[in-house]
Amino acid sequence: AVYWRKDRKMQADREAAEHLVQNILDMGEMLLSSGAEVKRVEDTLSRMGAACGAEKVNIFVITASIMATMEFSGGVRVTQIRRISRSPKYDFRRLEALNRLSRECCTGGLLRKSLHKGGAGGTVLEKKLRVWKQGENIRERYLGSLLVTGSFAVYFGGNLSDGLAAAAFAPLICFLQNRFEPFCPNKVTFYSICSFVAGILICVFSRWTGMFRYDRVIMGDMMLLLPGLALMNSVRDVLAGNTISGIMRLTESLIWTGALVVGFMGAIWVVI
């Protein structure tokens, strides 16, 4: 009976530890998908593992996966790997909220309680993470796209009509990003198709109405698709010593940009 109770306790401790590590990996995945740098994600997950009572914490993060091994008291060792298939969508508001939540977990003892009170701390963390898994505010994204495309079209030498035309085509690009991108096998396919479709419509309406210049409108709308932040983050990762992640992000960004240019140039060649 003594051994049976001991085995039951070890099994319960292991299940609580596995659930806790799963929540910590959820945090890491959301940080990466929000645009956090690799070194920052590794540091955050390591601190959260130490805060929950892990005696040894080993975290390895690249842009495509997260690997975590944690050793707890009583000989409980948990190893989990999380595949990151989605490309990051840079949402600094969510990133700030996740950083604040991670500090709350480390300083408030929220994670440590989950190993001693039936996983209550992990449940609380899971509920808080679920709030930020719901995604971004679509209305704010559409409004921001109108401001960005219109202002950049004017900035690149366009007039008021060019800015208004660029803003008019911005909701189409946002709609394709929200509805069509999840069905594409990769970013290259999406960027090629999205830029070609948007370019065709811009050039056709420009020739049909003659009210705006297609090149200025394309330059303004292109700002919604250019992976500028991804490119800069790749350089930052390389300078910070995360060479593998930096090279992966840099290569992806250059390929995406090439697909974007090919799509718009193909549209101009077909129509003009």
Where are these regions (language model features)?
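Juxtamembrane/transmembrane-helix boundary motifs in multi-pass membrane proteins
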Residues: 129-137, 157-161, 182-190, 212, ...
